[in-house]
Swiss-Prot record:
Self-association and partners: Monomer.
Pfam entry (one): TPMT
Organism: Pan troglodytes
InterPro entries named in the record: SAM-dependent_MTases_sf (IPR029063), Thiopurine_S-MeTrfase (IPR025835), TPMT (IPR008854)
Gene (name only): TPMT
Subcellular location: Cytoplasm
Enzyme class: transferase
Swiss-Prot/TrEMBL catalytic activity: S-adenosyl-L-methionine + a thiopurine = S-adenosyl-L-homocysteine + a thiopurine S-methylether
Full protein name: Thiopurine S-methyltransferase
Residues modified as Phosphoserine: 14
Record-level Gene Ontology MF annotations: S-adenosyl-L-methionine binding; thiopurine S-methyltransferase activity
Length: 245
């Protein structure tokens, strides 16, 4: 392992305010799906999660797992296939339908009575439910508490000005002895406006530190050729485990 590229103590960028006023609307996110601008989707699933999954699950079954801003993440099926109950929220109906189609899962849809004009999509097996609505409306549905949250591509996509509201929503969904798995990206925010946005360690502490123990499990070089178009020359991904204090 190259200690200068994957160690957990790489210096973070000091200009953390440069992206604070960046805003993407829900309509702009929906347009990304319509126009196929979904390079954030990982067809093979997230490799850090795959690496640590069995350690996190510890042989348990029947856990409730929440996927914020789930898109069509294949990891949802990983958990469902291991006997867990998966709930996701995604603003794009297209993304949700693509998930069920690509995973060859039959499903039904029904209105979310608490949020007029929205739907929930449920697998025929009953262990995957995907809510098509804003994540900030989700608490109105009384979906209950979760044992685990897999947050990859969610906190980094939320408008920086909405992070406190987002974090409070996530914390309100956590049950006892929870595991909150969080992936964030580290790059020079003066070179790329986001999303995905740069989320430094201090921001995670600010958002979750009063309630959670915070541990960075791994930091890996995530730079790909496509990231050159962002104007950056390095990109790291960090996997955090947040647990109950």
């Amino acid at each position: 392992m190259d200690g200068t590229r994957t160690s957990l103590d790489i210096e973070e960028y000091s200009d953390t305010e440069v992206q604070k006023n960046q805003v993407l609307t829900l309509e702009e996110w929906q347009d990304k799906w319509v126009n196929g601008k979904t390079a954030f989707h990982q067809e093979q699933g997230h490799q850090l999660l795959k690496k640590h999954l069995d350690t996190f699950l510890k042989g348990k079954s029947g856990l409730r797992v929440f996927f914020p801003l789930c898109g069509k993440a294949v990891e949802m099926k990983w958990f469902a296939d291991r006997g867990h109950s998966v709930v996701g929220v995604e603003i794009s109906e297209l993304g949700i339908r693509e998930f069920f189609t690509e995973q060859n899962l039959s499903y039904s849809e029904e209105p979310i009575t608490e949020i007029p004009g929205t739907k929930v999509f449920k697998s025929s097996s009953g262990n995957i439910s995907l809510y098509c609505c804003s994540i900030f409306d989700l608490p109105r549905t009384n979906i209950g508490k979760f044992d685990m949250i897999w947050d990859r591509g969610a906190l980094v996509a939320i408008n920086p000005g909405d992070r406190k509201c987002y974090a409070d929503t996530m914390l309100s969904l956590l049950g006892k002895k929870f595991q909150y798995l969080l992936c964030v990206l580290s790059y020079d925010p003066t070179k790329h406006p986001g999303p995905p946005f740069y989320v430094p360690h201090a921001e995670i502490e600010r958002l979750f530190g009063k309630i959670c123990n915070i541990r960075c499990l791994e930091k890996v070089d995530a730079f790909e050729e496509r990231h050159k178009s962002w104007g950056i020359d390095c990109l790291f991904e960090k996997l955090y485990l947040l647990t109950e204090k």
